[in-house]
Amino acid sequence: GTYDAFGLLNDGLDVQQPFQNFSSFLRWQILKWQNRLDSNDVYILEYASWLMRELSFLEDVLNECRPVFCHGDFDFKNILAEKNIITGLVDWEHAGIFCVEWELRKLSRYCNEKNGFLKSFFIGYYGSLPHNYEVKKRVIKYIEAADILGHLGWCKRSGNVEEYEETKERMKDFLHS
């Protein structure tokens, strides 16, 4: 089926915070994640500001993203496989109506041109590489960069100091790329 809005699903499967386009959803997420972090941290403010500037450049492309039902935490640790065949997904607490680009944000750090993973995914998903493959890669990388802000908050709330520092390093890589 198709969906008219982007957002998270709660345990009653009602859409929370529906958005009519993906850039509005991302803007809301970035502000929510930023507000959960230390508002006096100049680096966090600089990173969130960079995300908002990038969002304004990518807004039209992001709004072409079509909403679909997504797992929401598509990371290797949540994918069950046997003999190179995906047999299941676990950890559905972040499921919602997003887009394929959102779904791939966590896997993008493992995807590169050398291993061909992203190309293989798109060929499997669409039957061929989309005509705007390079644009899709940029969008996925941007969504990953935005999601890192949320992950930083998770690290802080869970007291995971080591992963917090690793995440800040990844943020620096995005900020200076």
Predicted regions and their residues:
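An alpha-helical support segment within catalytic cores of ATP-dependent transferases
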Residues: 1-72, 167, 171-173
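A short, ordered amphipathic alpha-helix with a cationic face
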Residues: 20-24, 93-94, 140-141
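N-terminal hydrophobic alpha-helix used for membrane targeting or insertion
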Residues: 55, 60-62, 80, 92, ...
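Active-site Asp-x-Gly
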Residues: 67-70, 75, 80-130
